[in-house]
């Protein structure tokens, strides 16, 4: 995630803004509708990044364990390939010693296919995307990304396409989810990160976060982090239709002190507002899509025990994780380095109870939309927090260093791949 001096981009014309507003990104809880066929069960997939597994949990209630799948069945083959290539080895070790905090990153993001037959996984350290058969545990297809690291993904509303950020190549690939064939790609800012399809699948929003592994973390050195921007691409032609430079918007809002590296983000149900976190900040901002300006800011409490040394904050993330209730009334925030999560009222921006959590690194919405589920990467568990009360419901142990949590589907009665 690297940065150069930020580009200033001309404001979008009104017609384009209106078009994008009308086709704005879907709420975080939206998932592709399963294809007709064998009975499916909705579940939560939890990617255990340092372990290379995904735990599969009930999507509601007690988040009971359903099964587990190994998402690196080809580990030995991939390692041989890496160790025989000095350039690949250099990046592999670089990931381990920076973003990986001394560990390899084996699973970043996951989505299931519409028929519930496979889970598609981006694997940072292996610089690829794979489809793993849920019945056999074998790899159906593999797509090596450009460059040397794969990152966040997004699935199209119909479930047929998956987008993945190739973070060292400043590229987003869009793949056929069934075959792994590339349908197209587009260029981004430095270190592309989050991806979001619009509700009709027409546009794809990507945010780039720049270099979050350098130690040049003082506010006055923020410009060294690279070219950070939102790139909106046509998901059919893969041409860029809009670029949003948040540096200019933050300056206009009176917050030149804040980083313009956009981290997790959520759109309101009517898709008129974007809520986003930025590097080094304990809080989030509200952006009006039609008027192209930042309208509100929420600063959340600091944990007195959190170090003030910004170089100790993992990948520049003070707070990293956000989801919105399906009705748009509440935001769930993961306060990563401050070791809590909280539910915020969207109308008033008042936060609820601060729920203690150990390095929470993601937030998603459960299957019935009544709770958010956070990954506690420091404690190897996931925790459900009630949207209505802001109180913790349940915690469930998972594997080593859970990060991304996604809703998906598996065949009814599935408890894991068949042995052998």
Where are these regions (language model features)?
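Predominantly soluble domains enriched in secretory-pathway, periplasmic, or organellar proteins
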Residues: 28-420
């Amino acid at each position: 995630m690297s940065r150069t001096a930020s580009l200033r981009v001309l404001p979008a014309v009104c017609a384009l803004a209106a078009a994008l507003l009308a086709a704005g990104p879907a709420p975080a809880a939206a998932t592709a509708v399963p294809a007709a066929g064998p009975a499916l069960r909705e579940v939560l997939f939890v990617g255990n990044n340092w372990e290379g597994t995904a735990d599969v949990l009930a999507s509601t209630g007690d988040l009971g364990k359903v099964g587990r799948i190994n998402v690196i069945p080809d580990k030995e083959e991939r390692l041989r390939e890496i160790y025989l290539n000095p350039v690949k080895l250099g990046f592999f070790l670089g990931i381990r010693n920076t973003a990986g905090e001394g560990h390899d990153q084996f699973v970043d993001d996951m989505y299931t296919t519409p028929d519930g037959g496979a889970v598609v996984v981006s694997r940072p350290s292996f610089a690829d995307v794979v489809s793993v058969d849920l019945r056999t545990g074998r790899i159906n297809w593999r797509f090596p990304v450009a460059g040397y690291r794969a990152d966040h993904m997004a699935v199209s509303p119909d479930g047929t396409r998956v987008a993945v950020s190739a973070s060292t190549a400043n590229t987003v690939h869009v793949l056929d989810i069934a075959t792994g064939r590339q349908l197209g790609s587009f260029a981004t800012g430095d270190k592309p990160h989050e991806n979001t399809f619009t509700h009709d699948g027409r546009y794809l929003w990507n945010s780039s976060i720049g270099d979050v592994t350098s130690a040049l973390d003082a506010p006055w050195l923020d410009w060294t982090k690279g070219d950070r921007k939102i790139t909106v691409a046509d998901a059919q032609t893969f041409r860029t239709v809009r670029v949003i430079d948040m540096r200019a918007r933050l300056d206009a809002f009176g917050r030149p002190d804040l980083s313009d590296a956009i981290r997790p983000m959520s759109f309101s149900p009517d898709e008129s507002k974007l809520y986003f976190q930025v590097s080094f900040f304990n809080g989030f901002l509200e952006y009006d899509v039609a008027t192209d300006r930042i309208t509100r800011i929420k600063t959340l409490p600091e944990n007195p025990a959190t170090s003030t040394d910004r170089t100790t904050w993992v990948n520049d993330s003070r707070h990293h994780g956000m989801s919105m209730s399906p009705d748009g009334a509440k935001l769930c925030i993961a306060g990563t380095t401050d070791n809590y999560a909280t539910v915020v009222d969207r109308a008033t921006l008042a936060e609820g109870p601060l729920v203690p959590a150990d390095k929470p690194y993601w937030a998603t919405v459960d299957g019935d939309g009544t709770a958010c589920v956070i990954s506690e990467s420091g404690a190897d568990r996931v925790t459900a927090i009630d949207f209505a009360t802001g109180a913790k419901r349940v915690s469930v142990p998972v594997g080593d260093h859970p990060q991304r949590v996604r809703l998906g589907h598996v065949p009814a009665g599935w408890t894991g791949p068949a042995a052998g």
